Amino acid sequence: MAVQKVKLFTEAPFTLSLGGTLQDIEIAYQTYGELNKEKTNAILICHALTGDAEPYFADHSQRGWWQTFMGEGLALDTSQYFFICSNVLGGCKGTTGPSSINPKTNKPYGSQFPNIIVQDIVALQRALLTHLNIPRLHAVIGGSFGGMQATQWAIDYPDDVSNVINLCSSLLFGAEAIGFNHVMRQAVINDPNFNGGDYYDSQPPEKGLAIARMLGMLTYRTDLQLTKAFGRATKAETEFWGDYFQVESYLSYQGKKFLARFDANSYLHLLRALDLYDPGFQYESLSAALARIKARYTLVAVENDQLFKLTELQKSKKLLEESGVDLVYYQFSSDYGHDAFLVDYAFFEKKIRLALANQD
């Protein structure tokens, strides 16, 4: 089934946390399974940084980003639950973002797109569910950037969600991770084609975006995985200053592939939203915000995650416990590193099933 779309805030504007408003917001979303009569089996899936509204394709015509986790009888069981997943505000996969047409100018927003944070993304998701007449969620689940969204749901709408499942995401982004994001942003901003973000009528900043993606890929993997996959193997035809080693060729391929599916401005906005995430924003303190959580909270850490470091997840665990949150915590090692939440089904299956069944 094709992605569904709806336009909200066609009359009153949507007010953003850092100032400014948006109107006529288009939201791309997809649903799976059937909502029961009591409306007690709805689960919101929150995608990661560069994800989209289609984690799964029921006909297997394509491979969704959570294809191995979803389906009848799997951890995210489409025969038992009703799933909703929407593209985030600021994205480029159908929901209003910098590449969308600004209704005031009839041109892409570009540099005029307002600054957004996770709280705005979550507020728009709540508006979508209200439109779909879904008052309450059995669970909100997400990995990485999606885990931040899941956390904020439990804080901003404590009476609307029973379970939170946060995979590979801390409450606050670490300094090193912010540093990585800064370098990635600078690669894009300093591309000659960036033009301050107004590049839609000319060549986009492809070189900068490809470089940014290559760096990002290194934070999603582990040195062990890269060593197993490539070691020091070289290409059959080497380029002394280019793709000499196979690992270099892999990164170049990933950078080029990314250009076909993502917008540079969206990348910048979402990276900054990741950096700025603070669950306590607009509350008296972080602890006061966490104390609002009524949902059962499952937190899963990957010990060798290169992006969301184990120390940051352990700090999050401590903060949640001190705030009285009903917490279930797991940590494990995976060759996949941060990307384990996308591919390591063997480990995550039982944890997700237990969380959705309200069991330890």
Swiss-Prot record:
Known catalytic reactions: L-homoserine + acetyl-CoA = O-acetyl-L-homoserine + CoA
Binding site for substrate: R213, D339
Subcellular location: Cytoplasm
Pathway assigned in UniProt: Amino-acid biosynthesis; L-methionine biosynthesis via de novo pathway; O-acetyl-L-homoserine from L-homoserine: step 1/1
Organism domain of life: Bacteria
GO molecular function term, any single one: homoserine O-acetyltransferase activity
EC number per UniProt: 2.3.1.31
Pfam families: Abhydrolase_1
All copies of domain AB hydrolase-1, residue ranges: 41-344
Keyword annotations from UniProtKB, A to Z: Acyltransferase, Amino-acid biosynthesis, Cytoplasm, Methionine biosynthesis, Transferase
Coarse class of the protein's main subcellular location: cytoplasm
Active-site feature positions: S144, D305, H338
Cellular component, GO annotation: cytoplasm
GO biological process: homoserine metabolic process; methionine biosynthetic process
Assembly description: Homodimer.
HAMAP family registered for this protein in UniProt: MetX_acyltransf (MF_00296)
Protein role: Transfers an acetyl group from acetyl-CoA to L-homoserine, forming acetyl-L-homoserine.
Family to which this protein belongs: Belongs to the AB hydrolase superfamily. MetX family.
Name of the featured protein: Homoserine O-acetyltransferase
